[in-house]
Design a protein with these regions (language model features):
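Bacterial N-terminal signal peptides that target proteins for export
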Residues: 1-8
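Bacterial N-terminal signal peptides
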Residues: 9-15
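Sec/Tat signal peptide C-region and signal peptidase I cleavage site
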Residues: 18-22
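Alpha-helical substrate-recognition element adjacent to the catalytic core
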Residues: 23-191
Length: 191
């Protein structure tokens, strides 16, 4: 086999390998997958990009709602270590129960989302991004529900919150976009 024939054969093999490794949108409804494929083909390798949200878009559940009790349960965030400026309302303690930061966060959300969302973002101040990433990685790797307590009226309820679970369909989409030269960015308002 001459050099030209070898190069053509190698090129065909590489092309077929690329086809075999191409991501399929298996976890998308057929009609939506078809529309996404068409959009990707129309925008492939043109220097385009796609931007997505993280919480409840790239994965199910909210990161902060599980990271707060996860870190609190480990003693990494406590009422005592909380910046005094973040003690917006009195804690709702009883003779038998000391209110958790998770419960406090929920009560702030009952006042208004514009109170609790900035509050929970600021709770993580004092941690470096590297430290937070380590705790997020640990939470995500555990995959286990995080035990919580909160007040429902004047009754203390025990429950658990789920850590984020990555949507398989979104991973497929991100991979498909990147395989076609479309940069993918994931943004979040979470800490």
């Amino acid at each position: 086999m001459n050099l030209t024939a070898k190069l053509i054969a190698a090129t065909l093999c590489l092309g077929l390998t690329g086809q075999a490794l191409a991501t399929e949108l298996k976890h998308w409804p057929a009609e939506q997958a078809k529309q996404l494929e068409a959009m990707i083909a129309a925008n492939a390798n043109k220097g385009n990009f796609a931007v997505f949200d993280m919480d409840n878009t790239s994965y199910r559940y909210d990161l902060e709602e599980s990271l707060l009790p996860f870190m609190e349960n480990k003693g990494l965030i406590t009422r005592d270590s909380l910046d005094p400026s973040l003690k917006l309302i009195p804690f709702k303690d009883t003779a038998d129960h000391k209110e958790s930061l998770f419960s406090y966060y929920y009560r702030l959300c009952e006042i208004d989302d514009m109170v609790c969302y900035p509050w929970v973002a600021q709770v993580f101040s004092g941690f470096t991004l590297q430290q937070l990433k380590g705790h997020v990685d640990e939470l995500m790797a555990s995959g286990k529900p995080v035990p919580v307590t909160y007040f429902e009226g004047d009754v203390v309820k025990a429950s658990e919150v789920q850590p984020p679970k990555v949507f398989t369909g979104q991973v497929e989409l991100y991979n498909k976009l990147m395989e076609n030269g479309i940069e993918v960015y994931v943004m979040t308002a979470a800490s």
